[in-house]
């Protein structure tokens, strides 16, 4: 039995997993009283880097694929304390629009450049051109203590406020 278990475990370790996992912990569940976020990024791009950008309103740092020069990041934080990350989802699309998809990195790049708080993000989304070209869960925390996930597709979102969760956290994969 031990050999079978070891063999199965070895197979699982060698299989590729392409699902990001993230979690947000609200300030009510952290010793500092400030929210925290974590993302495990599964990607086919093995070369990544952290880059600094002078944004439209805010300067920011972001995680990006090394071959990219500008225009998209896969998580980041700006000088106002606004942080964003995403996990891809493949079951949120409700339309059959013929549009470019996989634009999550572009959306996060522009959000970091323009938003300081969760409220700013929601207001900014009303001006961001649709279709958004996304199918993902975006995790956001801010310096004001905001902590939320946004389940988004091309034209709408559902907000999950982590500060109202009884356990004080939310895990998304």
Show the residue positions of the predicted features.
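A short catalytic or substrate-binding loop motif that flags glycine-/basic-rich loops and adjacent residues
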Residues: 16-18, 131
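Positively charged n-region of N-terminal signal peptides that target proteins for export
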Residues: 1-4
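Short, well-structured alpha-helical patches and their helix-loop capping segments
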Residues: 100, 113, 129-132
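C-terminal, well-structured catalytic/ligand-binding subdomain of enzymes
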Residues: 21-22, 27-71, 75-76, 80-109, ...
């Amino acid at each position: 039995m031990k050999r079978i278990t070891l063999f199965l475990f070895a197979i699982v370790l060698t299989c590729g997993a392409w699902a990001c996992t993230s979690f947000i912990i609200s300030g009510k569940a952290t010793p500092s009283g400030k929210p925290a976020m974590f993302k495990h990024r599964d990607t086919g791009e093995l070369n990544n880097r952290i880059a600094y950008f002078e944004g439209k309103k805010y300067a920011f740092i972001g995680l990006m694929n090394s071959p990219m020069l500008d225009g998209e990041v896969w998580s980041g934080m700006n000088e106002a304390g606004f942080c964003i990350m995403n996990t891809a989802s493949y079951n949120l699309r409700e339309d059959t629009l013929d549009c470019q998809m996989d634009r999550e990195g572009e959306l996060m790049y522009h959000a970091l450049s323009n938003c300081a708080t969760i409220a700013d993000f929601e207001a900014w989304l009303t001006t961001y051109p649709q279709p958004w070209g996304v199918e993902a869960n975006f995790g956001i925390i801010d310096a004001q203590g905001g902590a939320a996930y946004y389940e988004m597709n091309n034209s709408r979102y559902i907000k999950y406020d982590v500060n109202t969760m009884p356990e004080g956290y939310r895990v998304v994969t």
